């Protein structure tokens, strides 16, 4: 298999990207890598060219660039060229640590939507602290700020495929992030989405979940509209970071006694931090497009990049995209029926 | 001043409510309390009737009751009777630890909206860990699942009044919870709200805030639509609780060494937990109605109830409601102009 790598995206690109790719090359012997990037910067960093090919590009999409504009105008950027390679069948998957919006645009407009998927969405695996499994799929993380009920329904399908194919969870359960457990809770979008999902033949819906229970692991897939999904994810990250910071500060403030305690607890803290640092395990995936497209956080170092290659390999090995495609192709009536039920409800 | 107390609402009602009121009575010598509740249950709990009056009621709104229905049907419930006392001028403020939705309905339909406020909303003070002040106002916590831009604009006004009058923050700053820092981020509602707020003569708008920075204290008031505000608040609470739980578990798992460390760090953990437990400091306030209406969490114990009386006293002492009322009365043109600008934008 071949992975097209945007070598220029990310805070520590191209250095950490190239280092990560070399680790992955040594780890997975069936992956070939195409590095898209500025030759003068990337070339000196590669120590061993085995299964690594450099495709020189002349432009870079910056973190601050306006996504759609950047994708349209920077035609010789590392990201756009890597996306086009996937589109044209020269590579099987796309990886970037760069501008998320531009990667989304590249995924949707260049790699292309799977026919029948209305809105590709961003998904990630988060730690599930008390559930049956170690992780759950959370989506949409913010690809679509304005989600409709039919989109949320489709996220249930896409998320279930990711949970089964990549996290290895048999018949995954699905919940809808809402501001109450009862089915009449939420705004119109979530009320209607709940009704659609309740009768879903395509996945195993358990009902609503409130953001307070997110990390408890009461479902294998949690579906959210992109706006509140983004808010819940970021509030979770922000709170976890703030607490670790506060604990460190409290330890430093508490004199010899506290510092001794802190030293003794170091291994315990490390294990929690590791569990929380879900970014190390891989990236956010754009589900609903014609190939695996994965984004790691901008500050990803080599290890995270290498781990993400493992995640992409699993997606390819498990035929995630073709299985989604086949499912949607053979269930157009169900998806259509969902939309009609929806329209009937809205016009009632 | 007189506070009407729903003595029957909350997981530990009426015991902890009555205990809390007695603590508050001893602490604040200018407050009279009216306890609305089932006589046979409340009467035996009161140890000293000084400045405490029992108004017997025969019904109780339960946590699981459908809010509007319960408010309409249970006319002799402790909550409805307490709300009516405020409406009729027999009391200055309303307190309950009961059904939040029913309290919202009672506040809006019985106590009544301030003329000119389109949507009363739920606000709370959260800890600000790195800001200039210790706390900031976060609203709407979920009173309105479907918020319009003009509502978010009004929350900016209401929140600023709460920050100045109750938290004592001079010329408070305001931010809008959105899924990106740039002004073109978010769905239509948040894009338009940002434009309205940017030109706000009524408050000091600093721009968007992402949920990740919520606890950092970069603003004195954070305005959110009720749906994502609810999600962000609950994700914050859930993550904080989960982390404390995980730390405890990691300490227990880490042998003698870890347990010793945990024992040494106990005071440090206590101080963080106290800072995080914003519920102890008071309740969530329904802003935009004609009197202070405050809800503490259902599991509130006596201390939290007593502290909430202090919060209500500040609201009354500082003339929060009449100052909001006066401001809105004298700025109808501005509020109207905001709506017109909005309509122009929407129809453009």
Swiss-Prot record, chains A, B:
Catalyzes the reversible formation of acyl-phosphate (acyl-PO(4)) from acyl-[acyl-carrier-protein] (acyl-ACP). This enzyme utilizes acyl-ACP as fatty acyl donor, but not acyl-CoA. One of its GO terms (biological process) is phospholipid biosynthetic process. It comes from Leuconostoc citreum (strain KM20). InterPro entries: FA_synthesis (IPR003664), Phospholipid_synth_PlsX-like (IPR012281). Homodimer. Probably interacts with PlsY. Its main location: cytoplasm. Belongs to the PlsX family. It is an enzyme of class 2 (transferase). Its EC number is 2.3.1.274. This is Phosphate acyltransferase. It catalyses: a fatty acyl-[ACP] + phosphate = an acyl phosphate + holo-[ACP]. It is found in: Cytoplasm. One of its GO terms (cellular component) is cytoplasm. Keywords: Cytoplasm, Lipid biosynthesis, Lipid metabolism, Phospholipid biosynthesis, Phospholipid metabolism, Transferase. NCBIfam families: plsX. Pathway: Lipid metabolism; phospholipid metabolism. The keyword Cytoplasm applies. One of its GO terms (molecular function) is phosphate:acyl-[acyl carrier protein] acyltransferase activity.
